Structures are given as C-alpha cells and as structure tokens.
UniProtKB/Swiss-Prot annotation:
GO terms for cellular component: plasma membrane. Gene3D superfamilies: Multidrug efflux transporter AcrB pore domain, Multidrug efflux transporter AcrB pore domain like, Multidrug efflux transporter AcrB TolC docking domain, DN and DC subdomains, Multidrug efflux transporter AcrB transmembrane domain. This is Multidrug resistance protein MdtB. It is a multi-pass membrane protein.
Amino acid sequence: MQVLPPSSTGGPSRLFIMRPVATTLLMVAILLAGIIGYRALPVSALPEVDYPTIQVVTLYPGASPDVMTSAVTAPLERQFGQMSGLKQMSSQSSGGASVITLQFQLTLPLDVAEQEVQAAINAATNLLPSDLPNPPVYSKVNPADPPIMTLAVTSTAMPMTQVEDMVETRVAQKISQISGVGLVTLSGGQRPAVRVKLNAQAIAALGLTSETVRTAITGANVNSAKGSLDGPSRAVTLSANDQMQSAEEYRQLIIAYQNGAPIRLGDVATVEQGAENSWLGAWANKEQAIVMNVQRQPGANIISTADSIRQMLPQLTESLPKSVKVTVLSDRTTNIRASVDDTQFELMMAIALVVMIIYLFLRNIPATIIPGVAVPLSLIGTFAVMVFLDFSINNLTLMALTIATGFVVDDAIVVIENISRYIEKGEKPLAAALKGAGEIGFTIISLTFSLIAVLIPLLFMGDIVGRLFREFAITLAVAILISAVVSLTLTPMMCARMLSQESLRKQNRFSRASEKMFDRIIAAYGRGLAKVLNHPWLTLSVALSTLLLSVLLWVFIPKGFFPVQDNGIIQGTLQAPQSSSFANMAQRQRQVADVILQDPAVQSLTSFVGVDGTNPSLNSARLQINLKPLDERDDRVQKVIARLQTAVDKVPGVDLFLQPTQDLTIDTQVSRTQYQFTLQATSLDALSTWVPQLMEKLQQLPQISDVSSDWQDKGLVAYVNVDRDSASRLGISMADVDNALYNAFGQRLISTIYTQANQYRVVLEHNTENTPGLAALDTIRLTSSDGGVVPLSSIAKIEQRFAPLSINHLDQFPVTTISFNVPDNYSLGDAVQAIMDTEKTLNLPVDITTQFQGSTLAFQSALGSTVWLIVAAVVAMYIVLGILYESFIHPITILSTLPTAGVGALLALMIAGSELDVIAIIGIILLIGIVKKNAIMMIDFALAAEREQGMSPRDAIYQACLLRFRPILMTTLAALLGALPLMLSTGVGAELRRPLGIGMVGGLIVSQVLTLFTTPVIYLLFDRLALWTKSRFARHEEEA
C-alpha cells in the first residue's frame, strides 16, 4: 500500500513555473474564451428540458361527452396505443371537445413522435364522424416550458370578432416571425363567422325544416375548381360567383319556393356577423379581450426573445386602429432577470467572502491576490465549455458556479499554503514553488477527481429530474477541473514571482493579532487531539453515534419534491355548480374578478370561460393572476393565495383553486392544485361508486387541503327517447332526428367562406330567445316520407337525466383525478403516506387502481432513488480513492467523515423548517465530496511522514493534523462562505437556492468540528487492523 512519492522538482507544474509568459498567455486565452462564451450563452430560468409530449385536440361542436368519447376519442386512442415509445396516454372528452395528451419516453426524439402521431391520426380518419368540421390537430407541448409572455388585445370601439381577426392575421403572425418565438396561441374564441339563427315558428308555418335550410346554404356557397379553356391562341380560366361573403348575401339566399314566390333565408332566420363560438370568452382585468400566449423555441434566449417582442409592440400598435390596445399582462423574463441577477449577486458575494477569508488566514496581500485571480478565472473559463455543451445561464448553473467558488479556491489555498511554508523556512521562492507544487500535486489530483466522482451519479439520474440537474453537475465538474489546472499551473507560477520571505514575514498589527489567535487555536486543537487519541473508543463511539443519528434524521425529516417558487404568477380554476351556463359562468367570473383585483398584491388578471383544449366544461373558468414584482409587495405568493381564497369564499356558488406557477412543471394537463392522485376503473359505474367514498375519506385528512375531483356526473341531460316504430312508419330515421337537433342546438358549422386572408365559417342554430330551456325542443320539426312536417314531440318523449360533464381516460380506461395541496405544517411525504393509508382502509376492488401523477409521481420516483444515488456517490468516490491510493483501507478512513456531514445537513434543514427535497439532496451529495478533503489532506501528509521520516502512525497523523489544520480550516470556511449567500438569499428564486445553502452550511459546520478528531482515530484504528491482518496472513504462510 505504497503511495507514489511526490516529485520535488515541480512535477507537472515545472513547465508552467519556468515559463511564466506562456502560462500567462494561456490563462488569458481561457479568460477571453470564457468572456466570449458568457456573452453567447442564452438565459433561462432552468436548463432546457425537452419533455416529449404531444396534445391532440379534436373539436366537434354540439357533441355530448359520451359521443365525443365513443366517436372521436376511442378510435384515436386505439391507434395511438399502438405507437412505440409511448409512456402514458390520457384523454378528456367533454361537450364538443376531445383532448388527448401523449407522453413519450424521454429517449424518444420529438420529431419521431410527431411522425408516429400523424400516422396514427391518418389511420383513424375513416373511423371518425364524417361531419367532423376539422380533422384532429396535434401540437407539441412542453409542460416544463410555460409561455414566456401573455398579451391582451382589447378595443373600446370594435367588436371582438374584428379584433380577433386582426390579431390572428396581423399581430400573431408578426410576433411569430420574431427570432426565438416558437408558438403563439390565442384564447377568447371570437373568430368571425356568419351566424344563421332560424325562427322555428316561421319555418314551421312555411312547412320547412332546418335540414332544408342547411342543404340550401351548403349548396349555395362552394369554392371548388372549375377548369379552364385552352383555345388555339389563348387560355381562359373559369370562375364563378359561387361564394357568398357577407351576412347580407346570405339573407338574400332563396331557400325554397311556395306558390311560385321565393322564400329567402332572411324571411325565416336572423342572419348576422358574429362569433364562430358564442360560448367562449376571455377577459383581461374585467375587459373582454383576445389573449395571446407566446412560447419560445427550444434553446432560444428567453431574455432576448422577450426584448424583441417588446421592441416590436410599438410598431404593431401604430399599425392597428386607435381603439385597439395591446397590453403585456405577464412577462416571465421579469422574474427570470431578477432571479438571475440575484444569483449573480450571490456569486459575486461568495467570491468576495472567499477572498476575505483567504486574507484573514494568509494576512498577506500578494498571497491573497493569487487565489483572488484563480477563483474568477476558473469560473469564467467554465462559460467557454458551457457554450460547446449547449448549456444556458440559469438558476441551476449559476448555483453550481456559486457553490464552486468554495470548491475551486481549495486547490489554490492548498498550493499557496504549502509553498509559503517552504518560503518561510528560508527557501528561494522559485525553489519553494517547484518543491511545494510537486509535493502537493498528488493531493490536488486526489481532491479534484474524488470530488468529480461524487457528481457522476447525478448524470445518471432518471426522468426529468436527471435532465434538469445534468447541467448543474457538469458545470460544477468543469469548474473544479479548470480550478485544478489553474492551481497546478498559474498558482505556483504566481507564487514563484509574487511571494518572498520579506512579504510573508511583513506583519502589521492585524496580522500579528491574527497569528497569535491562530497559534492559540492550533495549540488548543493539539491538546484536544492528544486527549482524543488517548481515548480512541470513546471517539469511535461518537463517530458511530453520528452514523446512527444521520439514519434516524433521514427517516423522520419531512420530505418534499421541489421547492415551491414565487414567480409572481398564480394559476387558478373557478368551479361553479354543474350544468351552469356560459352566461351564468361569465357573470360569476366577473364577480370573482372584482374581488381579486382589489388585492394590493395583484397587478392584473386574465380569465377564460368556455370549452376548449384546456378547459373541460362550461361550469369551470381558468384564471391567471399576475402579481406585482416581489420588491413591490409585502407578501409572498402563498400568503397572497391564502388571502385571495378567503376573499373569494364570500362569493356564493363558486369554489376557487389556486396554485403558484412554477419554472418546473411536470404535469401534462391543467390541474386545479399542485398535486394529483388518480383513481382508475374499467367502467364509469365503478368510478361513480368509489369516487364519493374516497373523496369523503380524503377530505377528512389533515395532511392535505383543497381536495377536489374532476368527477362531475350530475350534468343535466335532456334525453330524447324516440319511439322507433312510430318514426319508422313516418319514414323518419334516427339520422334525421340527430340532424334536426344538431341543426338547432349544436352551433353547427355548415359552410366555409374563403377569403384572401383567412377562412370563416357559417354557423346554423335555432333562435331560442323566445323559447328558453327544454321548451325549445317543442319547436323541432322533421320531414316525413310523404313530405309532411312532423313535430318531434309526436314521436319522442323528453326525459331529464344526469350524465358526466366530461369523461376522462388514462391509457384507454376511465379515470378520475383527485387534486390536493399540502398545508404548511405538513410535507408532501406526509400527504403521500396519509393517502396510501386511507386507500388501504377502503379495500378497493381489484379492478380499481390508484396512482399518483405529475409532481407527486416524480416525488415518489426521486425518493425511491435518493438512497441509491447517495450510495452510488459514495461507491464512486471509494473507487477513485482506492485507485489513487492503491489501498482498500485508506478510502474507508476518508469516507468515515461522511456521516458527520449528513447529520449537520439534516439538522440544519430541520431547524430552518425546510423539507428534504431534491435541491437539499443535491447539497448532501456535494457535501460527500467536500468533507472528505479534510481526511485526504491529513492522510496524505501522514503517509508521507511515515514513509520519508520514519514516524510512527500516531506521531505521523498527529503532526499531519497540526500541520494541515490551517489549510483545512481555510478550505472549509471558503466552502462554507461560498454556500452562505445561497442560505441567506431572500430575492426572486430564493426558494430554489436556500435548501442547497442550508444543507451545505450545516453539514460543513458539524463535519469540520467532528472530523478533526474522528479521522485521526479511525486512521490509527485501520492502521492497527492492517497490521493485524498482515500478521495473520504471515502466520498462515509460515504454518503452510
């Protein structure tokens, strides 16, 4: 078990020490590359995470949830279910809309997934309803990358249909052309259309039916090829007046003749310009608006993209009528800028604190300048590598660099301290640099590679969390590697040129006082260490106690997934009684908007009512509440949410569910709350039996709050029970009945108007102003086989029933989603365990399954892999240390320091009231890499003293501890002060950074105190064990 002796001639550092110009120019090159890389790097909130999710939306106005499920969703699901690489498929079928969300494996390229989805849609086309207005439309959805900006377009003079047309054809297209913009979606649903509202009494009096009118309109408005004439000398293209463009033209359309007199559409219907869907609407601060959500392209710089949009807005506004106003409702870059700025400030603060601690220990300005140059050079040089790896400047990479501040200075400190020691003994600076750098080179390599080894398991973390922290781990590893290079090249070269006996011995009042203080501390430590070495078993029992305590703390500490951030945006869902109408829901959202906008923390509000790809039913509304910047409001987002919910509770007939928008969103569907739990069955009847029972139990749990379910089975249905025998005698088919109902009440899209700029629809419906409710069914007329007009009431009875407002599937089976939040005094781990315990008490049938979804599922996965992740980090470090030391024993001595770090980190988190979440776990893994450096520095010098000076193991480890006490204390304090700004952060994004800082500071404090005493004892214990093992082997060999 021999360690290779370090070279006294400078080793790999010799070339750089002897060639200062070349070394300086090399470092300048690294600096310039880093500066250029910094300017080229995009800025974002979190690393780029491509979450391969595709959403397929099919609209079929007028269709019930049951029809949408059986006629649209099911055929598509059967085709999608055959695709390879599909991880999960969920669907939501509501009145007139089917939304299928396809989540693929992370390893499947999104382009391949798109091709498979398109092929599946093509295969299902023949199975879909023939009168489907438009084929299914698919779009890429990245839940981890929400819109960067939300705009509202309003007008005080123009109707919203014209505003929507203007936004779609002019504003949205211009914004889409901006570099970095990926997708612009519109909400508000006010697309222009010609609406034909039939007068049921008028057409009945004339002996007509709605089907007669529909056939006349579709035949009168066509747009198809007509050919051309090709003569001997010229060619003539054929054209005709087959298109009708305006409501006035449709009014004049002759639909029938009676007694030789024409009957025009205007005689039996109100024909007007209106909206394609009158049951959709969006509002911005209570003013009706068209809302635009702008998403960026993958990899685009979110800051520059948002700046480009803002620069274009004045030009766009000038090109619009004066009554049209474009307003920025939310801009994610405001918080991203603030968060990145705060993190950069914390990085600068960490550098300043580290340099300060260096001066405190070295008490010499030239000696302080050297690491003061090495630290920023290592960090800046990292930016150059980040560019080549397609990384970005985000909260996690900046956190990595902030943490790296304490890491990278370690190498420089160890080199400077060792070289200074030889200079103080009287050697020339150049000789001291060569000797000191050569002697310490192996230690630097050990520190570097053992620390990088800890980060390796992070690269193999699965799912989206692994993708997220890959940039963090690699950025930190690159900074550490560059630091090692700088410490073995630039640092010894600068020591040889800048340090001297005179400068090191030059003292002032502060240096003399601090020197005396350090001498007393070292003397006290020496006395304490001597006593500890005399009582090894007591010390060993303390070490074992820390191991036991760390396990107990791990078991009992509250556990979470990801810190809840305050990004200044709140997503909300407003729920009203089932079967609430659009008008009723619009009125309720106005009442709620009045309450919300009175809150002093609220800056703006966007609300949406109606059924579309994200809103499942008319009795729910979506809200986006944009808060004032953090420095302009008194409370953080959770307090604002609590206050708003209390205020809205006073509005009768509505339930409000709010959750803060997060940079990391794993949920693929719009959710009412932060966490979801699903109940899946083979039939809707089974769900109707068990959902109420489970909900009743869950609502009694103190560990969860805001419990709600998307199971709504009390939607009013007017069931038309047709007497088939009577209908058959009259020559009336079920298709005739369905067509008549669809024409009257389905907002049926019956024709298309083509223009040079866009396409618009003709909508057919009955005018129900004078016959509201079920009375409108009495006006339906059908045509019998002999041409007579038959009232629907003569062949059918109307029954009122209840049915689900939406039918949801998970992997093709019925499912309901239960949403919940976690109260402040409980953790997500508590909530998950309570739900699982409750589920067991119900004794659910075998055909009913439960599963957590979204963030909760990711939490379970992360929690299950955390222990293995830490074990992998320890094993990786053991392997690296074993290779470096050519020993099975010494790595164990070094790794014995780890429980102390775990105890400190977990205690600090509990005292601070923080959960053990993913960020805190990353901090603990980093601690594994940091705290072992104390042992490495002790053992390196102890082994060298035993080998070169013939010291006994006890004397060697004792002298090594005293000799390395100062650099150990310096490096630990440097790492601690590097993490301190993260622990104390209070600005935007502080929730993300604070757990990392808390865990690292706590772990470093406890490990620093304990490992200075436990490591020497364990070193001697294993040394005796090695001698005993050798003697046993030797005895066996002699006996053999």
